Amino acid sequence: MRWPPWASESQARDKQDEQNQKNWDKSLNAIDWAAFTEPRTLIPTLILTTGIIGALQIHRRYLRRFPDAVSISPSYFRKRTILGQVTSVGDGDGFRLYHTPGGRLAGWGWLPWKRVPTAKKDLRDKTISVRLAGVDAPELAHFGRPEQPYAREAHEWLTSYVLNRRVRVLVHRQDQYQRVVASAYVRRAIDFPIPFRRRDVSYEMLTRGLATVYEAKAGSEFGGPELERKYREAESIAKRKGTGLWKGYRRNRKGWESPREYKTRMGLEEQSQGKGN
């Protein structure tokens, strides 16, 4: 039986519609790779990708905050400085620093979400313990040990000089007490004759006779031979003038005791007492 002519035409149209639908679906699912290589697409994509990668690198290199000494990358040692605010001064040659990467330019101090905490509970596990490089200050009373002469004066001076101030530290290394041994620098508005001159905190303590050059057999760190010479010269001048803890040094050398000698004597006494028990 032959189908009417119009039936064949209808079947042909259906097949054509079905083929057109398949072609349409295929075109929707196909990826036009050529479009990605067109300048109008390629250039904005490259700019956006480069911008994102650059922003991540800047954040990682300049704006990442270190909460404690252990978090500081060894790549910083002797190469890069860390800016922060001193939140407490524990003794005559050490303090705690709250890292503020980028400083005021990054919003620290004036943006509401970038303020240095003041409460102790908010500062817990969020500060870097800094040990001043190249110097040894007299020991305060602690762990049952008596206070050394000029220990309080050294602590009070350091507190007045750096507490709540912005300080920049050059980290030399970490020590066994989870601190960083670092050179610390501070700028003060009232500084005669040159305001905002950068001051080396360790050097300032030596010139005032509030510390001696660090003399331990191991673990001494100055930040280089040039700084060591500078520190020893400052100590020599203070010693000659009898400044600070050097007062009476010439008259009673045998009775005078350096911070290093004091710690050595205390350690020997404690060992002796331990053996006696």
From Swiss-Prot:
InterPro entries: SNase_OB-fold_sf, Staphylococal_nuclease_OB-fold
Domain TNase-like: from-to ranges: 80-248
GO cellular-component term (any): membrane
Keyword line: Calcium, Endonuclease, Hydrolase, Membrane, Metal-binding, Mitochondrion, Nuclease, Transmembrane, Transmembrane helix
Membrane-traversing stretches: 42-58
SMART domains: SNc
Segments of skewed composition (Basic and acidic residues): 11-22, 257-268
GO molecular function: endonuclease activity; metal ion binding
Main EC class the enzyme belongs to: hydrolase
Main location as per UniProt: mitochondrion
UniProt-annotated location(s): Mitochondrion; Membrane
Domain of life (superkingdom): Eukaryota
Membrane topology value: Single-pass membrane protein
Active site per UniProt: 131, 139, 179
Short name of any one Pfam family annotated for the protein: SNase
Annotated stretches, region: Disordered: 1-22, 257-277
E.C. designation(s): 3.1.-.-
Chain sites annotated for binding Ca(2+): 136
Family: Belongs to the LCL3 family.
Entry protein name: Probable endonuclease lcl3
Originating species: Aspergillus oryzae (strain ATCC 42149 / RIB 40) (Yellow koji mold)
